[in-house]
Amino acid sequence: MSFRKKTKQVKKVNLGFKIDCSQPVEDKVILIGEFAEFLKSKIKVGGKLGNLGENITISNDDKKINVQSTIPFSKRYLKYLTKKYLKKQDLRNYLYVTSSDKNSYQLRYFNIQQDQAE
């Protein structure tokens, strides 16, 4: 009697996420290439850093970062890494991450109102 080993088949999923950094890039607060490299080095696949392989591709335009994945990938994890980058660059007090639609995030400035009367 021979025993066959059951293999798990991973679903092929095509996911695409975008991070719109247009406001901070126009103000030259964030370098988009540096942010893309940060994501490439910090995304974990299979519990290992930088193990992207062909499963996850990260590309950047002038003001946007595109993340394409063929394995299950959480949008929330992308938000976590974005917040981690902002904290590392000491920008967390000025910028926040918000969801603009189902597959994208946007970096925005906090609205700081100063009292002009004083």
From Swiss-Prot:
Top-level taxon in the UniProt lineage: Eukaryota
The name this protein goes by in its record: Large ribosomal subunit protein eL22
Family designation: Belongs to the eukaryotic ribosomal protein eL22 family.
GO cellular component assignments: ribonucleoprotein complex; ribosome
GO term, biological process aspect, one: cytoplasmic translation
Residues making up the signal peptide according to the UniProt record: none
Record keywords: Ribonucleoprotein, Ribosomal protein, RNA-binding
Coiled coil location: none
Lineage of origin: Eukaryota, Sar, Alveolata, Ciliophora, Intramacronucleata
Gene Ontology terms, MF aspect: RNA binding; structural constituent of ribosome
InterPro entries hit by this protein: Ribosomal_eL22 (IPR002671), Ribosomal_eL22_sf (IPR038526)
